[in-house]
């Protein structure tokens, strides 16, 4: 197989190796696709609409991240990404009659948020960007899909109105960068940073914490 088109790209972007970054991308893709498909199904979209929303919700953040980094979107060269989206859609359709999945979706979305934040931040560091850019791209990777999902499903964007999704991703990305600056390994940075994302969101939901809103 000719892999010359991958020259200069991080190792995890090759089609074959299963590195930590690759696994993180697959996990976040599957989770975001599953949540997106369920949200679309609950809005009464047809099968095509469900598949479209699942795809947009799962790959838009990583695609935007890679564009900023001058890389090809990972789903173009890695068939496992598309496979994970298809699997998420199929699971949603098979279990479409299952109700009361709100808490389950919230847990999965929180997990996906943590994984995507770590994936975006770590990849940015591999591309030798500044620490500020790494944090920003980590947040972009995590929140873009959910924002587009809500807009396309004609829902009030959770990112802009409720909870602390953006803040949670920001805190996790900052944690990753801080640990990285102290020469901790990528695995430790990702585990601790991801835990911060999850903890921040869980605490904010439990105590109904959110950023202050503008009032006239």
Locations of regions flagged by a protein language model:
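Short, structured motif recognition centered on aromatic/hydrophobic residues
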Residues: 52-56, 63-69, 136, 140, ...
